[in-house]
Amino acid sequence: MKWKEQAVILGTRQYGETSIILEVMTRQHGRYMGIVKGGHSRRMAGLLQPGNFVEAEWWARLDEHLGLFRLEALDLYAARLILLPEALYALQLIVFHLRLLPERDPYPSLYDILHLFMQNFDESFVNAELLVRFEMRLLEELGFGLDLSRCAATGRQERLFYVSPKSGRAVCEEAGRPWKEKLLTLPQFLVRRAIRPVNFSDIINGFILTGFFLMRHVWEPRGIKQPSVRVNLIQLFERRFRM
């Protein structure tokens, strides 16, 4: 068995005295692991950092085997990532979420957002928006996607300002006004893609929205608390956006 594809490095762990087990995310093969022989060497250390973009070649005698990786560097983002705390936290959060998904199952839309994030990690607003979109897509991939296409009460497709915490469906301004204290705010960049720039309150409301449904459907059923890296990241965004 053999494949070759571009990949983002997610993490490593030691394997024996000189090798490592590498974890990557690819578009066509999903989250994949394999052995990198000699990966524990100083020469390989810079290449194998989380966030780096590589050409990964994997092969094994049988598909169910762990297999071996051969890598070629494409974009070594990691050296710049460590200079930006919010970008580093963001990558750690993405990796946390990707590990909730089955290994070796393709999730091309999540990979595309991850790749776009890596290309824009030094732009805070783009970075934050992509993270909200990533969490929205994660909910969808796990079977808990929100329906933001029309108002749950009236069927209208305009002025969708809220989301019902019970149904996960959008609610328009008119229908939601009497109940707005009990509804979640719907960030407009999730329903009106042309909005630029995305504003601070929309970003925070986006994290509140995705966090509510991730807690209900993903974290609590698995006995997981909201990851501390997510809390720290949102606090960093708040400080940066208010400067």
Curated annotation (Swiss-Prot):
All disulfide bonds of the chain are none
Q: Which GO terms describe its cellular component?
A: bacterial nucleoid
Which InterPro entries does the record match to this protein? ARFGAP/RecO (IPR037278), DNA_rep/recomb_RecO_N (IPR022572), NA-bd_OB-fold (IPR012340), RecO (IPR003717), RecO_C (IPR042242)
Its domain of life? Bacteria
Gene3D superfamilies according to UniProt = Nucleic acid-binding proteins, Recombination protein O, C-terminal domain
Pfam families from the entry? RecO_C (PF02565), RecO_N (PF11967)
Keywords, alphabetical: DNA damage, DNA recombination, DNA repair
Q: Which GO terms describe its biological process?
A: DNA recombination; double-strand break repair
NCBIfam families, A to Z: reco (TIGR00613)
The family line of this record is:
Belongs to the RecO family.
Q: In UniProt terms, what function does this protein have? A: Involved in DNA repair and RecF pathway recombination.
The cross-references to HAMAP family, in alphabetical order and at most eight, read:
RecO
The protein's name is: DNA repair protein RecO
Which species is listed as the source?
Answer: Bartonella quintana (strain Toulouse) (Rochalimaea quintana)
Which lineage do the record's taxonomy fields give for this organism? Answer: Bacteria, Pseudomonadati, Pseudomonadota, Alphaproteobacteria, Hyphomicrobiales
